[in-house]
Amino acid sequence: MNARNGRPAGINKLRAHTAALAVCAALCAPRAAVALDAAACTALQSFERPGSALEITAATTVPAGPAPAGPPGRAYSGPLPAHCRVDGILERRTGVDGVEYGIRFALALPDDWNGRFLFQGGGGLNGSVNPPLGAQAAGDTPALARGFAVVSNDTGHRGAGGFDASFFADQEATLNFLWLANGKVTVIAKALIDAYYRKPAERSYFVGCSTGGREAMIMSQRYPTYFDGLVAGAPAMRTGFSNLGMRSVSVAMSAAAERDASGNPIPGSALSDSDRKLIVDSILKTCDAKDGIADGLVFDPVGCGFDPATLTCAGQKNATCLSPTQVGAIQRAMAGPKTPSGRQVYAGYLYDTGITNTAPGTLPGLLNGAASPVGPRTPPATQDVEAEAAAVLQTPNVLGDTATWTNLSTFAGHGGKLLFYHGVSDPWFSALDTVGYYERLAEANGGMTATQSWSRLFLVPGMGHCAGGPALDRFDLLSAVVDWVERDRAPDSVVATGTAFPGVSRPLCPHPRTAHFEGRGNPKDAASFECR
């Protein structure tokens, strides 16, 4: 599929790590350098597109140098190439609430362009324009450093922090956030690329996680001819229900929590540090070696089979067991929210090594009992799941949800490729919810084998929300999707590394396959594993 115009519309042995690096080197190299002077960049200040309420607010040359600071979890401090940065606003207006709205965007046009365009997805409720780098799921080298033209935007509103929902008061701002803004920005970005380089982008890609993952799915569903390759990480599907799920975990864990002077549960007190270690050690004892080697990673979380009831104290509570109250709380938390009649309203969660994570800079592990980032600071002690589920259906997020649409015949028919990835220990959006969508997608599109000819899902053991945790959380899905689109090489595995396990690499395998140690070779090397 060649998306230029912007109109809607078995067992495999892992390649050696060095081969994977060679692929990246080939994909990262510029195809045809385009040398442009400062005047060509400045000239974009007068760019107009008929029928678009567009203002170019700046067009400046940026010399090669270090990257600017980016959002947590996607930091990149390496060098960036010389490029032209274009800043603009689409559809500036005053909303019904008296607030000024407009779709602000930033487009980086590298001097040595490789002919590719990448749309950088957002996060949270957006509301700011992040530096257009394309670092998400790109391993050690972001898209801009590879020669991609990269765009980012605020989806039509400015927010005070990542979860400022005040823009929902304005209908157009809401619709722009949910899906319209990214479609509009794609059209403008492609037009600017065409004007600057005097030729259109040869291939177009979209990469995002969380809200950006939902946005990637939106592109496959509502703009199926805009992009050739999409990478959707931990997609923020059914956001109201995922928040309900986080609250249900907090409520479940509050039953075992200590109380403050007012009788309220103290967040994070249901489990001691020794309890958390006991849980993770027990999960590893039950599930770690199922992949052929005990290495501190659970590569078959779906088939793990851990039961916390095995840790129930026979007598007094001590460091080698959990109280019946704690066990019950964990079981209810991991099962996911249900109504009194037993109806499951959001997916449950998988037993994994990151569910008790306490590392700073990331969301607390699922069982730490913390409140949702968008909920009350003090977790509730009770919950009316039925009422909350009904209330979710009245929120604007439902309009932009991506959990039910599985007819991607146009996207797939044009040769589009769609990669999903999700941290198994994600406390906010259950990995099982993404697995559920992917399996429904396969069912609606001719079965798993047929669907895997254009879409694949990779689960990341130990990883939290988009990054972090006791995980190998650095991997290059950007090269994987480019290689699939442009060379028809499907990603039978993706090599992952991470600071939590220095000197270790492992293959991430397309669901439902999992990584297994072959029993020979270096156990720290991904090349010693196969997906089966």
Give residue spans per PLM region.
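Cap/lid segment of the alpha/beta-hydrolase catalytic domain
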Residues: N114, G123-R198, L244-G245, A252, ...
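N-terminal signal peptide c-region/cleavage motif recognized by signal peptidases
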Residues: A29-A32
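A catalytic-pocket lid/entrance helix-loop region that shapes and gates access to the active site
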Residues: I218-S220, T225-K338, L459
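Catalytic-loop region of hydrolases
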Residues: V34-R116, V129-A138, V280, I293-V298, ...
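Conserved alpha/beta-hydrolase "acid-adjacent" motif
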Residues: W428-L432
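Alpha/beta-hydrolase fold nucleophile elbow
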Residues: K199-S210
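Short beta-strand/loop motif that positions the catalytic acidic residue
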Residues: F420-H422
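Glycine-rich nucleophile elbow surrounding the catalytic serine of serine-hydrolase chemistry
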Residues: G208-I218
